[in-house]
Amino acid sequence: MQFSFSNDLGTLFTIILAIGFIINLVLAFIIIFLERNRRTASSTWAWLFVLFVLPLIGFILYLFFGRTVSARKLNKNNGNVLTDFDGLLKQQIESFDKGNYGTDNKQVQKHHDLVRMLLMDQDGFLTENNKVDHFIDGNDLYDQVLKDIKNAKEYIHLEYYTFALDGLGKRILHALEEKLKQGLEVKILYDDVGSKNVKMANFDHFKSLGGEVEAFFASKLPLLNFRMNNRNHRKIIIIDGQLGYVGGFNIGDEYLGLGKLGYWRDTHLRIQGDAVDALQLRFILDWNSQAHRPQFEYDVKYFPKKNGPLGNSPIQIAASGPASDWHQIEYGYTKMIMSAKKSVYLQSPYFIPDNSYINAIKIAAKSGVDVHLMIPCKPDHPLVYWATFSNASDLLSSGVKIYTYENGFIHSKMCLIDDEIVSVGTANMDFRSFELNFEVNAFVYDENLAKDLRVAYEHDITKSKQLTEESYANRPLSVKFKESLAKLVSPIL
């Protein structure tokens, strides 16, 4: 009997192609019919393009980046923690539907339709007894965070996309360990991909002192994570149920301006008051979704009575993630833009939204609203960077003023309208933040905060370069090619 190596190799190759074709057909069926309610049309077409242009590679990419998330599995350990807040949400919805807004705050009354929409989410209840401070520099922020950790009396909860155990990370971990020695409860929830250089073993001493640590969507396989595409991008700190932080700064030396991108410009909020309850609720839900030990239940110590009148800044906390069809933060941003009468100020390091969001911005600009968009001048993710610029032509021709921040890297995620309302948090203005990642933003109805952040934005403009229609039209052909390629796959970036 004679064997032909070339024939056998050809047969094997044919079999592999056939298997790949069958797998792609099955995946195409799943994407089109079984996951149609979880995907936009552009995302569906982008995945089909990848599957059929790169059959076997497309299958591997789908395993890591394409699968959807089960809400049932995420929420299975929530117990009774939502019961009291469901009642509060229902009460506020009924009151708003009757025109009873429960406050004399002018911005809440004026933008009651935005408030009502955000009440559709479990974190979205409106609170008014709040004092808000803002930070745009990482050194200032973490100096204050370390002071607040030192003054903690009962517990500290941290939830971070990136918790780097470098200089800053070690300082914070040491401060937390000191509080454990004093008998406080300390929990850390970090993202397994965002904190890719962190291992659970790095927290052995912390855990030996009584601290608890969980990794979000942790992989059991080294270097492989089948939830690569659905990351917990939230950055939250809660101290004693009285004080909370939320915003764009991660934990690491890079966010102090010590990384390769230079000065790090971001926006973060420090909140004292009733809105901390919403941040605490979000932390508990996220912890319960990942923990393998006894779960959080509702306990009054986690939602204590606040220390007297603190301020009059109405706040709603909005969360979004891939397990929900209701894209709370995207819709909140869009509603703000569509409600603007005078001005819109937007900052986002990654700007790759869908057409409906782009159209909302264009409609506002064409209606005479003064619309500003600030993006980075340098890439930390090249493909995302070029996709960001691919939307510039339509926006510029509609009258949107676009700036590229030149004084380092802008990582701020902010939407501000009419010097009246501002949203600050973790959600970039892109498909990933709107639909794939777990995000959290604060919507603050406070003219003083809005004006302060607008002044900070105007200072940023002095350190930026304005993009014009002429300069954009004259960009090199190689840049145009990169933008076109990036835009083609932007729904899955």
Curated annotation (Swiss-Prot):
Superkingdom as given in the UniProt entry: Bacteria
Active site residues per record: H233, K235, D240, H411, K413, D418
Alphabetized SMART domains for the sequence: PLDc
Keyword tags: Cell membrane, Lipid biosynthesis, Lipid metabolism, Membrane, Phospholipid biosynthesis, Phospholipid metabolism, Repeat, Transferase, Transmembrane, Transmembrane helix
EC number from the UniProt entry: 2.7.8.-
Topological category with respect to the lipid bilayer: Multi-pass membrane protein
Reactions performed catalytically: 2 a 1,2-diacyl-sn-glycero-3-phospho-(1'-sn-glycerol) = a cardiolipin + glycerol
Single GO molecular function: cardiolipin synthase activity
Predominant place of localization: membrane
Record's GO cellular component terms: plasma membrane
Protein location: Cell membrane
BP-aspect Gene Ontology terms: cardiolipin biosynthetic process
Gene3D superfamilies per record: Endonuclease Chain A (3.30.870.10)
Role summary: Catalyzes the reversible phosphatidyl group transfer from one phosphatidylglycerol molecule to another to form cardiolipin (CL) (diphosphatidylglycerol) and glycerol.
PANTHER family hit by this protein: CARDIOLIPIN SYNTHASE (PTHR21248), PHOSPHOLIPASE D (PTHR21248:SF22)
Protein family: Belongs to the phospholipase D family. Cardiolipin synthase subfamily.
HAMAP family listed in its UniProt record: Cardiolipin_synth_Cls
Protein name: Cardiolipin synthase 1
Gene: cls1
